[in-house]
Amino acid sequence: VWTKRIETGEVVTAQHWKNGRELTPSEMSQRRVAELLKKIHGSKPLLNMLKRMEMEPITPNIMLKKINASLSRDVLTHHIIRKALTYLEDHIPNLDSRFFTVVHGDVNHNNWLLSDRDELFLVDWEGAMIADPAIDIGMLLYNYVPKQQWSNWFNTYGVKESMDLNKRMKWYTVIQSIGMIQWYEEQKRFKDMNTWLKFLNEVMNSNLFI
């Protein structure tokens, strides 16, 4: 990733162009996906780059304030949305910002590129932030990795599964799902919105003890 601050004060970022294809949803549980995500989260050069861009850490409270301000009246009519917002208010994660890392923010399979040389890349860094890595981990696992494979995924990534991590993953997946629902509602893509409403309901009903 290459960055440069221009005269307006904005920062331009770029990546080398690579020929290849997107990963399929079924490929997202592969070992190399977990390994690359860990490499990104642990990258000091990437973290320092974001700090040079004067990027401030994104805390759960900031995310919650932003999502509450963005929701339309129509989205708020959905019972699962109101239930999810109550959950978010009652379960705000508490992770020391010293443990925040580079977070991509959109680990959808469309953003994983497998090059002609069988090299894996994570592209589209517009939403990159300094935040809790559980933001990426949660969305990836809930969307693409069967629950019975989570333990193996954690081992590959190099983190010990814990109640705290599971709580944070669920919280961030819920709040990002609400954001997707609002976005699709604004775009009037109601089929996609309903898909995310169903997904949100599944996440809310999973791991009911957290």
Regions found by a protein language model. Name each.
Residues V1-R5, S115-L120, I210:
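Conserved NTP-binding catalytic cores of kinases and kinase-like/nucleotidyltransferase enzymes
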Residues V1-R52, V75, H79:
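ATP-binding pocket architecture of kinase catalytic cores
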Residues I6-S26, N61-S70, S177-F190:
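A glycine-centered beta->alpha junction motif in the catalytic cores
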Residues L37, L64-I67, A134, W150, ...:
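A general structural signal for well-ordered alpha-helical segments in protein cores
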Residues P45-G105, N207:
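An alpha-helical support segment within catalytic cores of ATP-dependent transferases
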Residues E89-I135:
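Active-site acidic catalytic loop and adjacent metal/ATP-binding pocket
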Residues S115-N166:
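Active-site Asp-x-Gly
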Residues S151-N152, T156-I210:
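Helix-rich C-terminal or lid/interface subdomains of diverse kinases
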